[in-house]
Amino acid sequence: MPEGHTLFRLAREQQAAFAGREVHVTSPQGRFAGQAELLDGRVLDEVTSYGKHLFASFGPDVVHVHLGLYGKFTSGTGLPPAPRGALRMRWEGPGEDGEGVWTDLRGATACDLITEGEVQFILDRLGPDPLRRRSDPAKAFARISRSRVPIGALLMDQAVLAGVGNVYRAEVLFRQRLSPFRPGRDVTADEWAALWADLVVLMRAGVKEGRIVTTERADRERRRGPALREDAHYVYRRQGLLCRICGTEVRTQEMVGRNLFWCPTCQAV
């Protein structure tokens, strides 16, 4: 599932391409046809994200998108390709130089037209987002510090923390040497502060680079140049391989419906 940095980057790109201009909105698949007709030809005011949610404001009407596991935006310049497959929503605009821009949405869990009040209802149910400068990590810690639930599960709860998914969960816990099985109430305030600060750095880097890289250069096989795909993570999808730090075999098991990855030595309970 795309994590928060992906939605933040998408919102920024769509803001640059479409905001302040009239947008031709269609739904070739038909599932968004009625809403698309209401929006077609209107000016897109703003595109923002919060956690794993994207919001595109056309005046008081807001397109809300949650990509889920299989959703994906594709985009380009010039004339868009002929519609094919389950194309839920298409935007077309003039672009900055008039050559034309487009973006297509397929496979999203949610693609709805909602009100500003409904946007606020969604936001009120989410925890702080490490990519939002005004987010308050104390709000998340207040819930974590009272919970018997393992921290590895709490980090995946969007009501606790917005935007973190399976990759960031595994990697930030490893980087902070925290066991994913430690109850939330046993995580100290200092440990939480360090984890939050690390998430802010990692997720901002994810926005900038367009991918998740969590390893330090000194811990990679190839230490020069950009991180290779196989060097990008410490534990995520490295089950059966040796820990980059201590040499212990990386393990995996399911937690809250997703595969968890950790080093039993570096992240001892």
Which residue ranges define each predicted feature?
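Structured catalytic/nucleic-acid-binding cores of DNA maintenance enzymes
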Residues: 1-269
